[in-house]
Amino acid sequence: MQKGEKLYEGKAKVLFATDDPNMLIQYFKDDATAFNGIKKGTIADKGVVNSLISTRIYHILEKVGIPTHLEELLSPREQLVHKVEILPIEVVIRNRVAGSLARRLGIEEGTELARPLVEFYYKNDELDDPMVTIDHAEVFGWAKHREIEEMIEMSLRINDILIGFFANIGIDLIDYKLEYGRLAVSPSTLVLADEISPDGCRLWDMETGEKLDKDRFRRDLGGVEEAYQEVARRMGLEVPGR
């Protein structure tokens, strides 16, 4: 597959065209950002680690029938992915109280929820990604009613799978974000896109409560690189050069 021109560069990834108009190359960067780009830095080998972690997770999800944009891993930090039209909505799944939920409601971080909480956020950096309702998404045309139902159903299935997966390696899945898109070759087909990695998940060690995710960068806790590497190690992934 031939890599073509750069089509888009975001905070953590770059998308390149290929010789197939319906396929893209997704390149994972080492750049780290927080608070919608206000805080910036670099985490050594983050792109490689996130690419490998996300690839492993998406392969697991594909095996149980969750459609994703991933086709294959091309190199440690590059994936071949299906071209999609990303919906301007992030789905956040919460299993415990943390982050903005703790701040908004004044509930102690780490409090276990009676059931997974599904939240929607409008993807807009200028507005700081505000939380929105299902009605907002439908009224403003961000997603169709059927797509919203599919996103909720898929997200809860993904949650069931990932809770068990991470528990088996001693990690609590606290919360995480998901992004979905419409396949370019079949716009009626919704697939999981973007990535699932320590960049977009809160992952706590089950025994110690140690944070193994980007909160270490957000909160200046140190050991960011080591935390990402630890997640990869527990997943049995070999990071080149390590």
Curated annotation (Swiss-Prot):
<dbReference type="InterPro" id="IPR050089">
    <property type="entry name" value="SAICAR_synthetase"/>
</dbReference>
<comment type="similarity">
    <text>Belongs to the SAICAR synthetase family.</text>
</comment>
<dbReference type="GO" id="GO:0005829">
    <property type="term" value="C:cytosol"/>
</dbReference>
<protein>
    <recommendedName>
        <fullName>Phosphoribosylaminoimidazole-succinocarboxamide synthase</fullName>
        <ecNumber>6.3.2.6</ecNumber>
    </recommendedName>
</protein>
<dbReference type="InterPro" id="IPR001636">
    <property type="entry name" value="SAICAR_synth"/>
</dbReference>
<dbReference type="InterPro" id="IPR028923">
    <property type="entry name" value="SAICAR_synt/ADE2_N"/>
</dbReference>
<keyword id="KW-0547">Nucleotide-binding</keyword>
<keyword id="KW-0067">ATP-binding</keyword>
<dbReference type="GO" id="GO:0004639">
    <property type="term" value="F:phosphoribosylaminoimidazolesuccinocarboxamide synthase activity"/>
</dbReference>
<keyword id="KW-0436">Ligase</keyword>
<dbReference type="Pfam" id="PF01259">
    <property type="entry name" value="SAICAR_synt"/>
</dbReference>
<dbReference type="GO" id="GO:0009236">
    <property type="term" value="P:cobalamin biosynthetic process"/>
</dbReference>
<dbReference type="InterPro" id="IPR018236">
    <property type="entry name" value="SAICAR_synthetase_CS"/>
</dbReference>
<comment type="pathway">
    <text>Purine metabolism; IMP biosynthesis via de novo pathway; 5-amino-1-(5-phospho-D-ribosyl)imidazole-4-carboxamide from 5-amino-1-(5-phospho-D-ribosyl)imidazole-4-carboxylate: step 1/2.</text>
</comment>
<dbReference type="GO" id="GO:0005524">
    <property type="term" value="F:ATP binding"/>
</dbReference>
<dbReference type="InterPro" id="IPR033934">
    <property type="entry name" value="SAICAR_synt_PurC"/>
</dbReference>
<dbReference type="GO" id="GO:0006189">
    <property type="term" value="P:'de novo' IMP biosynthetic process"/>
</dbReference>
<keyword id="KW-0658">Purine biosynthesis</keyword>
